[in-house]
């Protein structure tokens, strides 16, 4: 926790964004140049998401990294 803000519960947003864009985990994993099980671990909150992956996801979904992390509502 930094400055009273929790950013360890971003993973539900990853799934919501993916589903809102009608994408499968496999499609997102291919975009990120990784295997689907690795992406699945991010989406389920089993692994911390690296900064470079976070940035690529924000670009893919045309949103901010702050939104993905739950720091803003858009």
Tell where the protein language model's regions lie, with residue ranges.
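A short, Lys/Arg-rich alpha-helix, primarily the initiator
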Residues: 1-20
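Alpha-helical residues within the helix-turn-helix
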Residues: 19, 30, 59
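Short alpha-helical DNA-recognition segment
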Residues: 22-41
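DNA major-groove recognition helix of helix-turn-helix
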Residues: 32, 43, 61, 69-72
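DNA major-groove recognition helix of helix-turn-helix/homeodomain DNA-binding modules
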Residues: 52-67
């Amino acid at each position: 926790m930094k400055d009273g803000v929790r950013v360890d519960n971003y993973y539900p947003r990853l799934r919501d964004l993916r589903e809102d864009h009608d994408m499968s985990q496999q499609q997102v994993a291919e975009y990120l140049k990784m295997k689907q099980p690795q992406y699945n671990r991010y989406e389920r909150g089993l692994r911390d998401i690296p900064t470079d992956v976070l940035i690529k996801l924000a670009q893919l979904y045309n949103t901010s990294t702050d939104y993905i992390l739950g720091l803003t509502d858009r």
